[in-house]
């Protein structure tokens, strides 16, 4: 097996565009959508999901939640499902990992943590289209998202309607929304230490930053390393309004 590490999804995409070929890819879901839409990846054979094949461990053991999620269409206009092109490698949430000695847990419950001057140059954001734009939408729609959540909790909004409206907001791409998100992200850029892909883990562990927007798996790694090195029990919080499931 030849294992080829890549910096991010965009590097993977560019290499494929330049003619590189791979037998198996491990991209994020938004890149799977892009690759499928451009016919740059092939569907799995039906035999991959045959539970009667002894070595099909994924098909036999995948969680019902993931199986149901992957049964949805990969795009509105597509006849293909996520499962046609992808099998789950790992999944989790995105949120803020923070040092409680230097950051307030209440501040981490809101997307405005990115622009909070208390954490000027002590907080990082993700440097990819999905998570960066999602963060901007979180700030843009935070009040509306919290109101939706309040209606759901009060029983005046059904779970299905809540999910539909949540999905609409957090996938919103008309020009006026994108313009607002662009302005928001420019404000974010002025307050954060950096938009980063992987570097924040070491920066956090070394004490150069106090807050980092992270995938939950990397957040656990950071918390374990900081506690092992300094004895500080860091925390991970998902913004109350909404967050990204990956």
Task: Label each region the model flagged.
Residues 1, 129-132, 217-218:
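Glycine-rich beta-alpha junction loops
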Residues 23-24, 88, 95, 210-211, ...:
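A residue-level structural signature of the nucleotidyltransferase/glycosyltransferase Rossmann-like core
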Residues 1-3, 123, 234-236:
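Generic structural signal for residues in well-ordered beta-strands
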Residues 190-246:
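Extracytoplasmic/periplasmic substrate-binding proteins
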Residues 6, 26-27, 125, 195, ...:
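Short beta-strand and adjacent tight-turn residues that come in two discontinuous sequence segments
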Residues 1-38:
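Early extracytoplasmic/lumenal segment of secretory-pathway proteins
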Residues 30-191, 195-203, 222:
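Extracytoplasmic ligand-binding site segments that recognize negatively charged/polar headgroups
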């Amino acid at each position: 097996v030849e294992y080829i590490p890549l910096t991010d999804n965009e590097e993977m995409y560019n290499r494929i565009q330049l003619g590189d070929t791979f037998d198996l890819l491990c991209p994020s879901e938004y890149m799977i959508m892009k690759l499928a839409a451009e016919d740059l990846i092939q569907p799995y054979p039906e035999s991959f999901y045959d539970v009667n094949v002894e070595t099909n461990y994924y098909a036999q053991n995948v969680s019902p939640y993931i199986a149901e999620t992957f049964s949805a269409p990969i795009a509105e206009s597509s006849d293909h499902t996520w499962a046609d092109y992808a099998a789950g490698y790992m999944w989790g949430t995105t949120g803020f990992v923070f040092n409680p000695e230097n950051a307030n847990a209440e501040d981490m419950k809101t997307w405005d943590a990115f622009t909070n001057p208390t954490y000027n140059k002590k907080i990082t954001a993700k440097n990819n289209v999905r998570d960066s734009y999602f963060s901007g939408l979180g700030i843009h729609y935070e009040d509306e998202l919290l109101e939706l959540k309040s209606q759901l909790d009060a029983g005046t909004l059904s779970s299905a309607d809540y999910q539909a409206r949540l999905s609409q907001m957090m996938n919103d791409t008309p020009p006026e929304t994108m313009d607002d998100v662009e302005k928001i992200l420019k404000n974010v850029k002025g307050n954060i230490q950096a938009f980063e892909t992987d570097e924040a883990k070491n920066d956090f562990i070394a004490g150069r930053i106090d807050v980092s927007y992270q995938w939950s798996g990397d957040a656990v790694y950071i918390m374990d390393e900081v506690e092992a090195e300094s004895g500080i029990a860091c925390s991970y919080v998902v913004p109350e309004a909404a967050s990204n499931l990956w």
